């Protein structure tokens, strides 16, 4: 949506509110609640934030950007996609930072995306599961390690990497006490859904030195820098070549690769069906246990 169209749409909405107040003699006319809010935390992410925002724009009713003091062009890029940009000083706790971001979201559902990630073009197939009774949809994340010949890590630390990213906007759902790799609370029932995909760009954008610095920062915050995840070169299971600091348009380079396009648009029905069945079995078992108590 262009800036002109967006402003025109907002003015029409405002006009409808005023007319409704006059006709129906109401104090406040409440507009319909947005369906999907997208939350992205940022700080100096000018190299990747455009990929994240561009990928979610077709699906988001609102995009919330929570920044903690960017000094580069991150906010300039974010302003092209949303006017809902907030600032909160980072106090060494990612869980608290995300909880603040969640409080700014008004949609019925919230999708949390990291600033160095993007979603595949089949994300819409994931959204159909939002009406199936779950409070949380867990998605698979793939850590891309090469764009010259599309590949992602398949080591134990990187695959399967299930991420709790689609959550119902429920005040009972929040991030817990973990300072790093924060843990979501009160998210059941949850579905592991292999329909849409999240792609992680960290290994393309950052060389070994930058990733080692990040791992050390996380270790300082929480006593666990997750070196197996961020520094696979140090471990014997590392077998894939990584292409660091690639050409500026990563998505264009990736989508020239036919195998990536096929992967991006693929939905693994078997995994999703398996997880749905597991949830149904757990539900039935819980009902049976409750019945037996009486």
Task: Enumerate the predicted regions with their spans.
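Cell-envelope/extracellular polymer assembly enzymes that use nucleotide-activated donors
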Residues: 35-37
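Short, well-formed alpha-helical segments that are part of the catalytic scaffolds
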Residues: 39-58
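Acidic helix N-cap motif at the loop->helix transition within catalytic regions
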Residues: 50, 72-81, 122
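A conserved acidic beta->alpha catalytic loop
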Residues: 55, 59, 67-76, 90, ...
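Conserved donor nucleotide-binding strand/loop of the catalytic core
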Residues: 61, 75-100, 104
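Catalytic-site signature of metal-activated, phosphate-bearing donor transferases
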Residues: 95-102, 120-290
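Short aromatic/hydrophobic "clamp" motif used to bind/position activated sugar donors
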Residues: 110
């Amino acid at each position: 949506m262009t800036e002109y169209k967006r402003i025109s749409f907002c003015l029409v909405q405002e006009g409808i509110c005023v007319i409704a107040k006059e006709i129906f003699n109401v104090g406040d006319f409440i507009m319909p609640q947005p369906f999907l809010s997208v939350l992205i935390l940022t700080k100096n992410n000018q190299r990747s934030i455009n990929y994240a925002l561009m990928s979610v724009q077709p699906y988001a009713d609102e995009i919330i950007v929570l920044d903690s003091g960017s000094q580069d062009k991150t906010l300039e890029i974010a302003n092209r996609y949303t006017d809902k940009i907030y600032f909160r000083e980072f106090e060494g706790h990612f869980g608290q930072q995300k909880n603040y971001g969640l409080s700014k979201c008004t949609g019925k559902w919230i999708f949390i995306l990291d600033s160095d990630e993007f979603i595949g073009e089949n994300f819409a197939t994931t959204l159909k599961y939002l009406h199936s009774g779950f409070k949380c949809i867990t998605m698979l994340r793939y850590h891309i390690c090469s764009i010259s010949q599309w590949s992602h890590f398949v080591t134990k630390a990187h695959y399967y990497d299930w991420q709790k990213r689609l959550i119902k906007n429920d005040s009972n759902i929040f991030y817990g006490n973990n300072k790093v790799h924060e843990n979501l609370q009160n998210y059941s029932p949850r579905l592991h859904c292999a329909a849409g995909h999240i792609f992680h760009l960290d290994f393309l954008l950052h060389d070994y030195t930058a990733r080692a610095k990040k791992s050390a920062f996380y270790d300082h915050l929480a006593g666990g820098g997750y070196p197996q995840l961020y520094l696979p070169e140090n471990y014997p299971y590392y077998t894939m070549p990584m292409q660091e600091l690639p050409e500026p348009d990563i998505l264009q380079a990736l989508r020239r690769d036919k195998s990536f396009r096929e992967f991006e648009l693929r939905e693994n029905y078997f995994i999703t069906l398996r997880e749905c069945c597991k949830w149904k079995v757990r539900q039935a078992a819980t009902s049976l246990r409750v019945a037996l108590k009486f």
